[in-house]
């Protein structure tokens, strides 16, 4: 019997009633991972021994009836630090790195007796939108194994979509949770910047990065956010604002809610069938009692350019620490210190990472800083102001998560600009530090379409309220790929 169709609440009831044990649930999850892994390639590391040891310890002390997550397995993106479990960021540079500490998000999960079952595949150092830049493998879309799963958190999305695990963690710098969630038909949230501690997250773009949850349903996503969200003195950007329970508004109606639909989100570059899906969703929200009106976010068209200057600049600084001296990969053909640096970084980083380091170094260089990095920061402010103006009159923003459904493997990975443009709808949310969710909203050519809901800072509970209301009157979240046991 597989438990992957059970919700977290249903699994919790079984555990409390002792109809299953944490060990049995963990063993079954490991079986589900192994039986599907060859098809989708979600994991870099499966921590079988450690997970079973942890499950046995939980069984020994007993399941806490008041702790929903007690004994529940969790998959973790491989750029989030896990003590004594390989954390590679999908890079040759860190192919053998075992951290000596847990990320705060992981420590929070352990504190709730969650079981880290393994580390998921991703684009190298989270730089990519297809999980094809990984040093280890290419992950495949759960619905069509000839398509990409999205990125950079592709493994975390396919692990949930394929029924390997119920819950997973990813990170989102420019859409890296929401895009793969959309491509795989699951729920993925990028929280408000600072809601989840970045301590232990291998840094890419420090002003943009945020850890967030994947789950099959809106409520389970909120339940996982309840676990990982916390203020943290180890992260200077951690926010003190906290919602006691992110599920608190789920189940409430949305009558009177005002939702904005930016005309730019349905314009050039958006697949016509994606546009139709979003407009149908807008009508569904109106049927639920919300008001949906067209607005404008005029500076969003500059988002991709601004993002790739800022994110690459921050990456070029953050990745200086990988030099072959302290830990990780070191080139063995170096004759002096300079050659250690040059050869290690040349051999240890993949092409996309090196491309972004070079772009960022150029943007920060003398003579170009004002023309590129400084100007990008100024336009970022204009993008933030656009959102502020809309949220002065509206509760949420609605739009597609991605301009297309999942594209084919090996189709865009040799065209960086085309790959970058795939994030045009998610990037502005990171630039503004806002919360955004992707939920299943339909299918085009048999592939899932994601609907994005964006809110002002610290309004995750309102986003979940609206997302759950839509989910309650649709069945897209119930449809599953063949690999999960569905008929698609």
From Swiss-Prot:
UniProt keyword annotations, A-Z: ATP-binding, Ligase, Nucleotide-binding, Protein biosynthesis
Domain of life of the organism encoding this protein: Bacteria
GO biological process: translation
Active site as annotated: 77 (charge relay system), 152 (charge relay system), 176 (acyl-ester intermediate)
Pfam families assigned to the protein according to its UniProt record, in alphabetical order: Amidase
EC number(s) given by UniProt: 6.3.5.7
Gene3D superfamilies on file: Amidase signature (AS) domain
Reaction(s) catalysed (UniProt annotation): L-glutamyl-tRNA(Gln) + L-glutamine + ATP + H2O = L-glutaminyl-tRNA(Gln) + L-glutamate + ADP + phosphate + H(+)
GO molecular function: ATP binding; glutaminyl-tRNA synthase (glutamine-hydrolyzing) activity
The protein's enzyme class: ligase
Annotated GO CC locations: glutamyl-tRNA(Gln) amidotransferase complex
Role description: Allows the formation of correctly charged Gln-tRNA(Gln) through the transamidation of misacylated Glu-tRNA(Gln) in organisms which lack glutaminyl-tRNA synthetase. The reaction takes place in the presence of glutamine and ATP through an activated gamma-phospho-Glu-tRNA(Gln).
Quaternary structure, from the entry: Heterotrimer of A, B and C subunits.
Protein family according to the UniProt entry: Belongs to the amidase family. GatA subfamily.
The name this protein goes by in its record: Glutamyl-tRNA(Gln) amidotransferase subunit A
Gene name per UniProt: gatA
